[in-house]
Amino acid sequence: MQKNVIMSVDHLSKDFVIRGKKIGEKSKLLHALSDVSFDIYEGETLGIIGESGCGKSTLGRCLVKLHKPSGGTITYNGKDLWNMPVYDREAARRDIQMIFQDPYSSLDPRKTASYSIEEAMKVHHIGDTARERR
């Protein structure tokens, strides 16, 4: 049985402009991602590993729409992630998750772990009784 492609990343690139620290110093272009391509199939989970500074977080941020790519395309269920209608965008936001390598950047230290889990369950429309059992 052939599985459906749910996300496709084609020739993705992301550049950042680094401004000079001194007056008159030229800006530099930092190539964080260059020509990244892959497909994620239905039922798969993607894990990205690599050395510090290799672009893992930048790629993740592009996939969850926190950074706009400089080039290439990201499609989710056959639709361009950056140009999809609001309804589809909300569904994609529920389905695509990112776990940051630093827990302080992904969890709110003012909230309990159970509150954070419950909040995610509400987003995914898991009922109150099921939520309480878990």
Please provide the spans of the model-predicted regions.
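ABC-type ATPase nucleotide-binding domains, specifically the catalytic core motifs of the NBD
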Residues: V17-E25, K68, D80-Y87, K111, ...
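The feature captures the beta-strand-to-loop junction immediately N-terminal to the Walker
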Residues: I49-E51
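Conserved catalytic motifs of ABC-family nucleotide-binding domains
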Residues: M98, P103-Y115
